[in-house]
Curated annotation (Swiss-Prot):
<feature type="modified residue" description="Phosphoserine; by host">
    <location>
        <position position="92"/>
    </location>
</feature>
<keyword id="KW-0945">Host-virus interaction</keyword>
<feature type="compositionally biased region" description="Polar residues">
    <location>
        <begin position="100"/>
        <end position="116"/>
    </location>
</feature>
<dbReference type="Pfam" id="PF00424">
    <property type="entry name" value="REV"/>
</dbReference>
<feature type="short sequence motif" description="Nuclear localization signal and RNA-binding (RRE)">
    <location>
        <begin position="34"/>
        <end position="50"/>
    </location>
</feature>
<comment type="similarity">
    <text>Belongs to the HIV-1 REV protein family.</text>
</comment>
<keyword id="KW-0597">Phosphoprotein</keyword>
<dbReference type="GO" id="GO:0016032">
    <property type="term" value="P:viral process"/>
</dbReference>
<feature type="region of interest" description="Homomultimerization">
    <location>
        <begin position="18"/>
        <end position="26"/>
    </location>
</feature>
<dbReference type="GO" id="GO:0044196">
    <property type="term" value="C:host cell nucleolus"/>
</dbReference>
<comment type="function">
    <text>Escorts unspliced or incompletely spliced viral pre-mRNAs (late transcripts) out of the nucleus of infected cells. These pre-mRNAs carry a recognition sequence called Rev responsive element (RRE) located in the env gene, that is not present in fully spliced viral mRNAs (early transcripts). This function is essential since most viral proteins are translated from unspliced or partially spliced pre-mRNAs which cannot exit the nucleus by the pathway used by fully processed cellular mRNAs. Rev itself is translated from a fully spliced mRNA that readily exits the nucleus.</text>
</comment>
<dbReference type="InterPro" id="IPR000625">
    <property type="entry name" value="REV_protein"/>
</dbReference>
<keyword id="KW-1048">Host nucleus</keyword>
<keyword id="KW-0694">RNA-binding</keyword>
<keyword id="KW-0488">Methylation</keyword>
<keyword id="KW-0509">mRNA transport</keyword>
<feature type="modified residue" description="Phosphoserine; by host CK2">
    <location>
        <position position="5"/>
    </location>
</feature>
Length: 116
């Protein structure tokens, strides 16, 4: 695995094997029996899958030190965002060689919410 040390690679492979064994221990339910029996088996199977997913997350967090939540992307305030069509205007196959964009206030574009 490119850019990673060998020790963390073996640890990652070991964790993947453990998680694979967990998922293999819960095969899909059999499609036999009455509708109610099939529904109950699927419900129990989904509950076990949910537990396996939670256990897998805990294993990854404890063994690899993965942060529990992904890093949030910091976005600028909506007031500072603008649409700029000078780079990729038009449909596919056309070049965006149009006239320059005219900046309009958002209130003139969206209106005030009252009908005239």
């Amino acid at each position: 695995m490119a850019g990673r040390s060998g020790a963390s690679d073996t640890e990652l492979l070991q964790v993947c094997k453990i998680i694979k064994i967990l998922y293999q221990s819960n095969p899909c339910p059999e499609p036999t029996g009455t509708r109610q029996a099939r529904r109950n088996r699927r419900r129990r199977w989904r509950a076990r899958q949910r537990q396996i997913r939670e256990i897998s997350e805990r294993i990854l967090t404890s063994c690899l030190g993965r942060p529990p939540e992904p890093v949030t992307l910091q976005l600028p305030p909506l007031e500072r965002l603008t649409l700029n069509c000078s780079e990729d205007c038009g449909t596919s196959g056309e070049k965006g060689e149009g006239s320059p964009q005219i900046s309009l206030e958002s209130s003139t574009i969206l209106g005030t919410g009252t009908k005239e």
